[in-house]
Amino acid sequence: MFYPVKVGTRERWSYSRIREVLDMPNLIEIQQNSYQWFLDEGLREMFRDISPIQDFTGNLVLEFIDYSLGEPKYEVEECKERDVTYAAPLRVKVRLINKETGEVKEQEVFMGDFPLMTTKGTFIINGAERVIVSQLVRSPGVYYSESIDPSGKKVFGATVIPNRGAWLEFETDVNDNIFVRVDRTRKLPATVLIRALGYATNGQIAELFDDNEHIRITLERDNTESAEEALVEIYKRLRPGEPPTVDSARSLLEALFFDPKRYDLAKVGRYKLNKKLNLSVPTDVHHLTKEDIVASLRQMLTLMSGEGHKDDIDHLGNRRLRSVGELLQNQFRIGLSRMERVVRERMTIQDVDVITPQVLINIRPVVAAIKEFFGSSQLSQFMDQTNPLAELTHKRRLSALGPGGLSRERAGFEVRDVHHSHYGRMCPIETPEGPNIGLIGSLSTYGRINPYGFIEAPYRKVNNGQVTDQIDYLTADEEEKFVVAQANAPLTDDGHFIEEKIDGRHGPDFVLVAPERIDYMDVSPKQMVSIATALIPFLEHDDANRALMGANMQRQAVPLLRTDAPYVGTGMEYKAAKDSGVCVLASKDGTVERATAEDIIIRHDDGTLEKHKLLKYLRSNQGTCINQRPIVMKNERVEAGQIIADGPSTDHGELALGRNVLIAFMTWEGYNYEDAILISEKLVKEDYYTSIHIEEYEADARDTKLGPEEITRDIPNVGEDVLKDLDERGIIRIGAEVSTGDILVGKVTPKGETELTAEERLLRAIFGEKAREVRDTSLRVPHGEAGKIVDVKVFTRENGDELAPGVNELVRVYIAQKRKISVGDKMAGRHGNKGVISRIMKQEDMPFLPDGTPVEIVLNPLGVPSRMNIGQVMETHLGWAAKALGLRLATPVFDGAQEEDVFATLRKAGLPETGKTVLYDGRTGDPFDNKITVGYMYFLKLHHLVDDKIHARSTGPYSLVTQQPLGGKAQFGGQRFGEMEVWALEAYGAAYTLQEILTVKSDDVVGRVKTYEAIVKGENIPEPGVPESFKVLIKELQSLGLDVRVLSENDEEIEIREIDEDVTETAKELGIDLHEDLPAPVIHEAGEGEDDEYFEEDEEAVDDEPMTFDDDDME
């Protein structure tokens, strides 16, 4: 039934029936291999393409010979700390040849710092960890289409798409004429282009295409007689208005399609063309040839005669991946070509005798191109670091968006839909919900990328009905030709199929065939899904929509204080944690010399020592806590590749995103209405779902026009009680507990000089500068935040730290919070069963089992049937049995425990086979009427925490334009009282409430100050004034040339004043600065949907770290 399997240091009992024939590849090799290719091959290709650069006379020649990468200046951790880029200097060996004198100069030229990939497959850019997402684009090649004209006639098209260069399109009309469009211009008869290629006479053309009737029809429309006329005709279409000559026409056509500098099919385009058109053009010819054009037209004629078939552009054989290496190469190419222009110009301007390669080469465009790519490309994303699975998935993400890809608005249904060629290549489940659905996917578990950028899936070869252990990787095109059996087809011991008819896939169809007809067999049942999906047990019993939510929500699980691997797993947990890079691995066999919370020292068998420093309480990109702890003891033997320290969300080397909790499916007093969750106080007390969150705050002392700012403990008008936790520098001490409004870094800024009286000037003269006016601009804990100070970092110019221009000192303070689970937090299981905590109840009031154990979570049974995610019920049953047996189980996707296995395991554990039991009401002790399903389910706490969302405003900033309060937590905004809310007040005649909401609480600038004054002084609240929006309305009408005036009831004109003097005075007295809105100046009005940083950004890691560039870096 089930058997033990060793995963890391732990045993899991697996229900799998299918032997694994192929180990899963390293899960982040898609990133690493691509970047390695770039360093080894990609750069070399770029320099080879651009070299040699000649000046316009051909006298000076600049050649790039070789390049090398130096050592990075700082280690990865130090780069994060100092906010610098993890990069190594790129040096290029350049040779300058003067052909007149024969003089040769060689020099090594520095070409800027090149960002390096870390061992985890990420980049550190300006101290932030980023990931370059792979892009799915249309492959270069030739594509055929057919559609039906409104008249009912079939019309055909063919398009030759290069990697870069002009498109060549053939199309037919209703009368079977064939036309050609060159580079999206007006169409010409196709024979004109063929004639221009050198097939001058009608006879030659007819012979070339075996006297095809469509060609004959087209020739009748063609009014050119010779190759020269044809060239001129094409030139007229491409360059209307310029006088055509045969020579200029010939060189234009040459440049468009036959010049390697202007037209590039790339290696993959040549491969696709040769394969599609059965050509044997050499693979290093990356431009079009005459044969290509003729063959592509010939193929289209075949299609018109009813043979062959049109291409499906959503097929993965026609879409390829651009990974990091290629994206970088394209960016580098842009930089180099800009540099090439500069070099050419400098060759002509400068004196030939004193010229050196160093003088010619300007590296700025190259550096700027790379910087721009990493800093602001759509595909360079701020890494989602919520937990290890989120990191791993982000690195394996495939996006159809980005430069050269699709846009959300233009992408239709077909592009987003699941396609049969996705099988084993791209996960059909894991994709975001929302506008990006189907445009962003995830690489399947066993998928790999071939040198052409196509995704390959592995299959076992089948010979005459016998399955071998030979593994072939097939691209989507190759797979179309074969019949592929499922991984779970029953086999005999020697690998023959048992059944007489086998289920198989052939292209888009499912077939039932004899064993001899089978060509290949799947290597594993989980090869069609991604990592996140493969972590869902009983996936086969869940509806796809809920599985999608389950896969996405696992990536939002917060790392908990105490981790606990699931009782019911899928066997993928170990591999996912190991490859995510958050754990520490032993590099060689050896013995542990020392294992402390700080570091682990291992003595290898060859006698060398290796020290692994552990990461302690660092802040992740998402503010969760990164902490590593050793799981080996002193003198323990370790093997190469063994996990020796756990990272966040891992438990003994296994991914552990949540906790195993005892749940019951029952309603309870309406507290689990609409997916709400009722939990026991035990989960709070025993820190089941407590997580650590670390926030970073920074203060910098700059040079201002009035003098430098100063970080100091000496702050004006602040009592000693406020300064108690600051050290002598004015920076908070580590370990201090702080809450809203406390000073973290004391800082003063010089105020503008005021007119001094004679006495003050005398004091100044005697006591020097001391009496200068400064104002308090200290860094304080923001509204709603609190915690303990865990780290303080100080960077100064004197210590040689690299700081932004104008900054003299930078202080970073890290505040950690322990967040217990609370009402309003979002929780979820792995099956898309999500909900919000509605009540935390005393342990003694929870329903309890016959043996007295109180239930920990109560879920609504109505959440199951309509959602069709029965996997959660199966997991609950099996979890109960696992707990009773004291085992951890693995039920791999599509190859896990069957219903009978679950019942058998429950029996073995001595539990009722139904998985149900009598529960008793904790308040009365009475049994509930019916038996209730109870058991252990793995439940996660998600990164949508109520502490981050709850928000209240008293007095805050107003928008400069409308003078109304801003919106959203990030802006410390107010709650919008909208149209419908106004109706509600109108309906009940609440006139005064309505009046103050529309005036003093909103945009009546004068009234707000007077009201504040009245409240402070304890007087009655005065009449409100005119709201700003009313003034704006009048101004708008006046700007349309309408004479609008405001009259009172007795027809007297009312003067609408601007903010008057006494208001400004009052404001000053009350300490309200009207011009610098409280508490922070207004930056902008947030657009709709972006009103704060917490709108559900379930997908695509948000780029919340804007990049800064110096102007001179950009060209």
Swiss-Prot record:
Catalytic activity: RNA(n) + a ribonucleoside 5'-triphosphate = RNA(n+1) + diphosphate
EC number: 2.7.7.6
Annotated keywords: DNA-directed RNA polymerase, Nucleotidyltransferase, Transcription, Transferase
Pfam families assigned: RNA_pol_Rpb2_1, RNA_pol_Rpb2_2, RNA_pol_Rpb2_3, RNA_pol_Rpb2_45, RNA_pol_Rpb2_6, RNA_pol_Rpb2_7
GO molecular function, one term: DNA binding
Gene Ontology biological-process entries: DNA-templated transcription
Region annotation (Disordered) ranges: 1084-1115
Biased amino acid composition, Acidic residues: 1088-1115
SUPFAM superfamilies: beta and beta-prime subunits of DNA dependent RNA-polymerase (SSF64484)
The keyword Transferase is assigned to this record: yes
Function, as annotated: DNA-dependent RNA polymerase catalyzes the transcription of DNA into RNA using the four ribonucleoside triphosphates as substrates.
Family statement: Belongs to the RNA polymerase beta chain family.
PANTHER family: DNA-DIRECTED RNA POLYMERASE I SUBUNIT 2
Protein name listed in UniProt: DNA-directed RNA polymerase subunit beta
Lineage, top ranks: Bacteria, Bacillati, Bacillota, Clostridia, Eubacteriales
Annotated gene: rpoB
